[in-house]
């Protein structure tokens, strides 16, 4: 079975239908008498492009992902637009965080890469930014929050990448981390972080998840121009 979230992850595995997916795609490619296949997408799409290229087929891959994590590229189209939307979300959270004296955690898409969270966090003026590439220390996070509170700042904004994990989880293999989270009934660490902050600081913490809003809507002018340049 192939799941939609990663439709090409097991492309070479022959499933219950006894069909080799790559060979089937190659057959379709040749039957359509294609000169070249143009693919637009992220890591899964480009993995498929690589598999087809290994079958001596002409393939051109264009990097389209909000994660900005395609190897060998400086920027992917879709990323700039998502940063704009996530930044706007963080901007808006400042108002309610300040008026209600709360710690607000904004969970931003990015399971393996923190580019989106990092850029939106910097642009939106987040006080703390947590990304998958750097395992966090919850005690240091709480210390930073308390330091702001003691200095007279009645709120804090924390930008959290959905794929971030703490230093203890960093010692575990990915599958083990996923298993433990599943047993605890959580997918991301954001709600756990909020609960830990409340427990350790006695300050109210809330979570906001823009989610799939980052993946839709009208593209920014930058992304429109970038995509056009890729296409010519």
Question: Which role fits each region the language model picked out?
Answer:
Residues 5-59:
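N-terminal glycine-rich phosphate/adenylate-binding segment common to multiple enzyme folds
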Residues 7-8, 42-45, 57, 62-69, ...:
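Short, ordered loop/turn segments at secondary-structure junctions
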Residues 28, 36-41, 47-51, 58, ...:
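Accessory alpha-helical/coil subdomains and C-terminal extensions
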Residues 72-83, 218-224:
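Short beta-strand elements at the ligand-binding edges of bilobed clamshell
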Residues 185-232:
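C-terminal non-catalytic interaction/assembly regions of soluble proteins
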């Amino acid at each position: 079975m192939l799941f939609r979230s990663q439709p090409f992850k097991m492309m070479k595995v022959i499933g219950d239908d006894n069909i080799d997916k790559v060979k089937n795609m190659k057959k379709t490619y040749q039957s359509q008498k294609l000169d070249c296949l143009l693919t637009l997408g992220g890591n899964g799409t480009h993995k498929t492009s690589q598999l087809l290229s290994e079958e001596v087929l002409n393939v051109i891959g264009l990097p389209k992902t909000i994660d900005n994590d395609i190897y060998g590229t400086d920027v992917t189209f879709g990323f700039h637009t998502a940063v704009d939307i996530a930044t706007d979300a963080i901007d808006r959270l400042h108002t309610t965080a300040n008026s209600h004296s709360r710690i607000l955690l904004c969970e931003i898409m990015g399971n393996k890469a923190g580019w989106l969270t990092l850029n939106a966090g910097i642009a939106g003026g987040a006080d703390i930014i947590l990304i998958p590439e750097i395992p966090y220390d919850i005690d240091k996070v709480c210390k930073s929050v308390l330091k702001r509170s003691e200095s007279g700042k009645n709120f804090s904004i924390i930008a959290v990448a959905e794929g971030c994990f703490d230093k203890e989880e960093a010692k575990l293999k990915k599958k083990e981390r996923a298993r433990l989270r599943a047993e605890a009934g959580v997918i991301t660490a954001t709600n756990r972080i909020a609960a830990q902050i409340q427990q350790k600081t006695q300050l109210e913490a809330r979570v906001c998840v823009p989610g799939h809003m980052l993946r839709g809507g009208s593209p920014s002018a930058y992304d429109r121009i970038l995509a056009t340049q890729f296409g010519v």
